[in-house]
Structures are given as C-alpha cells and as structure tokens.
Amino acid sequence: MISKPTKSDVMRELRDYIFITLGLISYALGWTAFLIPYQITTGGTTGIGAIIYYATGFPIQWSYFIINAVLMTFAIKILGPKFSIKTTYAIFMLTFFLWFFQLIIVDDKGAPLQLVGEGQDFMACIIGAIMCGLGLGVVFNNNGSTGGTDIIAAIVNKYKDVTLGRMIMFCDIIIISSCYFIFNDWRLSLIHISEPTRLLSIS
C-alpha cells in the first residue's frame, strides 16, 4: 500500500522545485549573459551544445534538449523515478530559460550582448563560471540534476565505486579538451566551477 504524502513531504518537494528553478535561472544567465557572447564553453551537454552553436549556429538549447532526451530514455529505466522526474523538469526549464534569455540579452543588432565590454573574455569567463557553478550547486543540493554528464555519472556511480565528482570531471575534461582542439582558442575553454561535489577542471 502506497502511503499518502504528508504536508511536510509536499512542502519539502515544493521547496526543492523552487530552489531548483532558481538555480537553473542562475545557470542560464551565466551562459547567456557571460559565456555565449564571448564564445566560451564548459563541460556537460550545455558545453556540447555551445560547441555545436559556435561551429554551426544551431541553437544551444535544442542541442542540449536533444542530447538529454536520448540520455533520459536510459535514466528512466536505470535510475529512480524521483531522480528522473526532477531531471526531466530541469531539462525542460533550462531549455526554456536558455531560449528566453537569448531573446532578451542582445545588442542593437540582435547579437549576444557583451555585458562586461569587448575583449573582456577572462572577466566574462570568471563571472559566468561563478553563476553557472552556484546555479548547479543549488540544483544538486535540492535533489535535482541538469541531465547530461550528470546522468552518465549517476548511472556509473550506481554500479561502480566511482564518485560523482570524479566521473563528471572526466566527462567535462573530454568535452572541454575537444573544444580546444577543434577551435584552437583558449577562450573556448573554461575553469568549471561548481558545487563542492565537483572538482575543478581546466583545459
């Protein structure tokens, strides 16, 4: 028999979703306001989407969504429904926020607005990294996930004695390194700052 959730359970879940949403807003703003305008990328499926966007112009949010849709087919079967539900919510919301902020954070010509000025790649990199890292930290600390390498890491962690932080770092290093070799530009690499369970990565 399935027990009926208590009021405290409902409030706890509601709190999780509120903070997950706030974390996603910070993450999406870090990308659209500071990373995309300066063609900087990080690890994760958002980073893969950024590489595709810089190379082809294909919208970052749709690459992110398509990749995660594939990964979620595996996550639903392997990981618990609670993880899958919150991850699905985060994927849809982050896709929306990336799309929305790219519509409004533009210059007079409709191009991504460089908020900290032209040539300020390093400063934009630092600010964007902090916003993205804080956002991801809030999401993870409230039992959420943005999908992508987080899903891969969670699946591996379930069967192998490998910490989430190490697995995510490994995936991020591959993504960021491939970006450098493809474009041969240091600006497209980023010190990936995140919650305490992650390690710093740099290409």
Model segments located where?
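C-terminal ends of transmembrane helices
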Residues: 23, 70-82, 142, 154
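Cytoplasmic-side transmembrane-helix entry/capping segments in multi-pass membrane proteins
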Residues: 83-93
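Short amphipathic alpha-helical coupling elements at transmembrane boundaries
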Residues: 47-57, 150-158
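Mid-bilayer segments of alpha-helical transmembrane spans in multi-pass integral membrane proteins
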Residues: 92-104, 121-142, 163-164
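Short, Lys/Arg-rich, polar N-terminal cytosolic tail immediately upstream
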Residues: 1-13
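Structural signature of hydrophobic alpha-helical transmembrane segments
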Residues: 55-65, 121-126
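Alpha-helical transmembrane segments of multipass membrane proteins
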Residues: 29, 51, 72-74, 96, ...
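Single conserved hydrophobic/aromatic residue that forms the stacking wall/gate
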Residues: 191-203
